[in-house]
């Protein structure tokens, strides 16, 4: 336990919070070929691989994911939410933050209904998150 004098000389440092989605906090200056600090809510990227992954221990499924090269040249794994998708290699997608708890190494989500990604077909409830238009009935 420090004395009051020690705390006066060198006060306690508060922990700095690390970002949950660090690739969205980097920009890339292609003219200078260097990274800059540039926070953004989403980033555009190109799919380099689309596949399935099995989740961690108590769960069992084939979760869809895509390896995406972002506009700042960082490659990340992003989860494809919803049932069915139209993504393939070279598809242009919009990536947002948000991890998938049972997939190790997946810290990003692909935004459905933006750029080359279609919305989920036949979805009636909770359409906003899945890029589905209102049905005409």
Swiss-Prot record:
Cellular component annotations (GO), alphabetically ordered: small ribosomal subunit
UniProtKB keywords: Methylation, Ribonucleoprotein, Ribosomal protein, RNA-binding, rRNA-binding, tRNA-binding
Stored PROSITE patterns: RIBOSOMAL_S12
Region (Disordered), start-end ranges: 1-55, 118-137
GO biological process per UniProt: translation
Residues modified to 3-methylthioaspartic acid: 102
Pfam families in UniProt: Ribosom_S12_S23
InterPro entries according to UniProt: NA-bd_OB-fold, Ribosomal_uS12, Ribosomal_uS12_bac
Listed GO MF terms: rRNA binding; structural constituent of ribosome; tRNA binding
Source organism superkingdom: Bacteria
Family: Belongs to the universal ribosomal protein uS12 family.
Protein task: With S4 and S5 plays an important role in translational accuracy.
PANTHER family: 30S RIBOSOMAL PROTEIN S12 FAMILY MEMBER
Subunit structure: Part of the 30S ribosomal subunit. Contacts proteins S8 and S17. May interact with IF1 in the 30S initiation complex.
Protein name (database record): Small ribosomal subunit protein uS12
Organism: Staphylococcus epidermidis (strain ATCC 35984 / DSM 28319 / BCRC 17069 / CCUG 31568 / BM 3577 / RP62A)
């Amino acid at each position: 336990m420090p004395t009051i004098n020690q705390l006066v000389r060198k006060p306690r440092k508060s922990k700095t919070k690390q970002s949950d989605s660090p690739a969205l906090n980097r920009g890339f200056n292609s003219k200078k070929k260097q990274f800059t600090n540039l926070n953004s809510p989403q980033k555009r990227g190109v799919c380099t691989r689309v596949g399935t992954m099995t989740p961690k221990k108590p769960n069992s499924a084939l979760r869809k994911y895509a390896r995406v090269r972002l506009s700042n040249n960082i490659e990340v794994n992003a989860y494809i939410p919803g049932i069915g998708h139209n993504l393939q290699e070279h598809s242009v997608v919009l990536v947002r933050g948000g991890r998938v708890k049972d997939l190790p190494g997946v810290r990003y989500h692909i935004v459905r209904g933006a750029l080359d990604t279609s919305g989920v077909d036949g979805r009636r409830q909770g359409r906003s998150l899945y890029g589905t238009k209102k049905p005409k009935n």
